[in-house]
UniProtKB/Swiss-Prot annotation:
Oligomer status and interactors: Associated with FCER1G. Heterodimer with CLEC4D; this heterodimer forms a pattern recognition receptor (PRR) against fungal infection.
GO cellular component, one term: plasma membrane
Any Pfam family matching the protein: Lectin_C
The organism of origin for this protein: Homo sapiens (Human)
Keywords: Adaptive immunity, Calcium, Cell membrane, Disulfide bond, Glycoprotein, Immunity, Innate immunity, Lectin, Membrane, Metal-binding, Signal-anchor, Transmembrane, Transmembrane helix
Protein name: C-type lectin domain family 6 member A
Membrane-topology annotation of the record: Single-pass type II membrane protein
Taxonomic lineage from the root: Eukaryota, Metazoa, Chordata, Craniata, Vertebrata
Amino acid sequence: MMQEQQPQSTEKRGWLSLRLWSVAGISIALLSACFIVSCVVTYHFTYGETGKRLSELHSYHSSLTCFSEGTKVPAWGCCPASWKSFGSSCYFISSEEKVWSKSEQNCVEMGAHLVVFNTEAEQNFIVQQLNESFSYFLGLSDPQGNNNWQWIDKTPYEKNVRFWHLGEPNHSAEQCASIVFWKPTGWGWNDVICETRRNSICEMNKIYL
């Protein structure tokens, strides 16, 4: 009897082993499928919202630098390589001297616009990146020359966010704003003729992932 039961026991163990491997294989397949679905959902969630902008920026910038922003959601803020990061914006300091309109065009071609200062902290950060020997165009102008200053992105021109040098603006023919370092007061805004050639500062919103 013992000799007859041994093959059955071996066959039973083989069948159990086969079943276990089958269950394991199915489990792995299901997990893989879930992973793939998760990746697809994540891909569409991430790139569905930012894909259009990333696609547009790809023609201007070859790479992005991303920074962890702690517990914020989304947690990664990205700027084009060599741009400066502050708050929710990226900044590029251009050393090419151009007239105001060409400076703005240069920013637009990089997916940005001339800088708009919303806070003193923002300006304080930017001036640390500037060369005191040069002045830089801002995204602020007075197209009609009637002291009706306007930001390039339509941000309201607030009285509490104005950093003009003492006595500025002072001439209706000077319809564009620049930031310049004057001793002993330091950095401040000055109205200048738009057709003069100056350096400039570009600003764009960060890309969040």
